[in-house]
From Swiss-Prot:
The keyword Transmembrane helix does not apply. SUPFAM superfamilies: Class II aaRS and biotin synthetases (SSF55681), Nucleic acid-binding proteins (SSF50249). PROSITE patterns: AA_TRNA_LIGASE_II (PS50862). It comes from Streptococcus pneumoniae (strain ATCC BAA-255 / R6). Homodimer. It is an enzyme of class 6 (ligase). GO terms for cellular component: cytoplasm; cytosol. Belongs to the class-II aminoacyl-tRNA synthetase family. The keyword ATP-binding applies. This is Lysine--tRNA ligase.
Length: 496
């Protein structure tokens, strides 16, 4: 290590490096080797929960544990400490006369943050705390930096997000939140697997952005000398698999959108998309409700979910309402009536709804009304269906009213949690929708997509009637962990 670097270290870091060197001089590897535990902290607590001090003493049972040293007290020939593993903490009781002088020195010189292995007798203290009375201490890894001063609950938000590892060490609530996230994803997989869906993987690098209305990240493939984009959705590749006969597929994976960041948006996020042949959007509503209720039950149990003080009746059937009916109920404006674009624009002006340059159809105005007046009222789980064709380029038209599509979005607490529809499987109609999107892009709509001719070709080989779904995993995790920002459910959120 250079002298220059040593000068950058603070006193605590220098002392820890000196201890590292001392361990090496004793023939101890400061960064350890494989260590076999017989139990973790929670397993011991569960196993001995009903035994008091005397009963434990009579059983004379031993255990071998390992973890990070997070508290340490005592002096002279006796010490107490807590080791933290992934399940929690357990106390160790170390006596010099029980472990020997040389072994006691390892404990005595250990710093908070170091990893230790402990063999010993399972006991309970006079205060009733389950502990391990050490018979041998093994040094497993040296921490060269001290834990933050606010170790018992890291509070600096910037540090929490930039150095998630420190947050996980110091904040048990945060640690458990990410365990819950993992369980939510596992349970969604389990639910779909049991219904015969096949999990697949599709490309992250695309030649053309498609499957969603979003601005992509652009990159360049040097060997092929072509520009490519990071996927903004998995939709079009998954539907190619439906064409190929897979019938029931899903993918859980990262999506990338070059857009703004706020409490519910991060440039990269996790979604699940699901496609089922021979189904329509009504079937997919049932599937969506089942997925979310199963995930909620697995981590929250039966009953409603409390989110930021509001009781969400996630365990009850979700409300279903047509977009036009929802708008009429809130504003009194009836978009069921036939009207020209100019008439719709006049109504928008009267209601002070902004009209963008690329609003070329009445459907654009209808969608703007929904976003302006209805979204903020949707607290309980609600399926809003019947989106206009103009804002649904991949959805099948409703056979009874071709101004609208067989599409729905799921809203909870005013936020969109899912988007689904009866898939458009008519290649001629799909091409005309793509062309309309390309025109909107020319008029300044950054979120409009281009034309994916390869996808059109795939549809020309025939795709069965199909229902498809996309759910934002991160927002669902926010709901089920009662958190208000997406950064709290992403281990490593995007930072400046």
């Amino acid at each position: 290590m250079s002298t220059e670097h040593m000068e950058e270290l603070n006193d605590q870091q220098i002392v820890r490096r000196e201890k590292m060197a001392a361990l090496r001089e004793q023939g101890i590897d400061p960064f350890g080797k494989r260590f076999e535990r017989t139990a973790n902290s929670q397993e011991l607590k569960d196993k001995y929960a009903n035994l008091d001090k005397e009963q434990l003493h009579d059983k004379n049972e031993t255990a071998t544990i390992a973890g990070r040293l997070v508290t340490k007290r005592g002096k002279g020939k006796v010490g107490f400490a807590h080791l933290q593993d992934r399940e929690g903490q357990i106390q160790i009781y170390v006596r010099k006369d029980a472990v020997g002088e040389e072994n006691y020195e390892i404990f005595k010189k250990a710093d908070l943050g170091d990893f230790l292995g402990v063999e010993g007798e399972v006991m309970r203290t006079d205060m009733g705390e389950l502990s391990i009375k050490a018979t041998h201490i093994t040094h497993l890894s040296k921490a060269l930096r001290p834990l933050p001063e606010k170790f018992h609950g890291l509070t600096d938000v910037e540090t929490i997000y930039r150095k998630r590892y420190l947050d996980l060490i110091s904040n048990r609530e945060s640690f458990e939140r990410f365990v819950t996230r993992s369980k939510i994803i596992s349970e969604i997989r389990r639910y779909l697997d049991q219904k015969g869906f096949l999990e697949v993987e599709t490309p992250v690098l695309h030649n053309e952005a498609g499957g969603a209305a979003a601005r992509p990240f652009i990159t360049h493939h040097n060997a092929q000398n072509i520009d490519m984009v990071l996927r903004i959705a998995t939709e079009l590749h998954l539907k190619r698999l439906i064409v190929g006969g897979m019938e029931r597929v899903y993918e859980i994976g990262r999506i990338f959108r070059n857009e703004g960041m706020d409490a519910t948006h991060n440039p990269e996020f996790t979604s699940i998309e699901v496609y089922q042949a021979y189904a329509d959007f009504q079937d997919i509503m049932d599937l969506t409700e089942g997925i979310i209720q199963h995930a909620a039950k697995s981590v929250k149990g039966d009953g409603p979910v409390n989110y930021q003080g509001t009781e969400i009746k996630i365990n009850e059937p979700f409300k279903r309402v047509h977009m036009v009916d929802a708008i009429r109920e809130i504003t009194g404006v009836d978009f069921w009536q036939d009207m020209t674009l100019e008439e719709a624009k006049a109504i928008a002006a009267e209601k002070k709804v902004p009209v963008e340059k690329h609003y070329t159809e009445v459907g654009h105005i209808i969608n703007a009304f929904f976003e302006e007046f209805v979204e903020e009222t949707l607290i309980q789980p609600t399926f809003v269906y019947g989106h206009p064709v103009a804002v649904s380029p991949l959805a099948k038209k409703n056979p009874e009213d071709q101004r609208f599509t067989d599409r729905f979005e799921l809203f909870i607490m005013t936020k969109e949690y899912g988007n689904a529809f009866t898939e458009l499987n008519d290649p001629i109609d799909q091409l005309s929708r793509f062309e309309a999107q390309a025109k909107a892009k020319e008029l300044g709509d950054d979120e409009a997509t281009g034309i994916d001719y390869d996808y059109i070709e795939a549809l020309e080989y025939g795709m069965p009637p199909t229902g498809g779904l996309g759910i934002g995993i991160d927002r669902l995790c926010m709901l089920l962990t009662d958190t208000t920002t997406i950064r709290d459910v992403l281990l490593f959120p995007t930072m400046k």
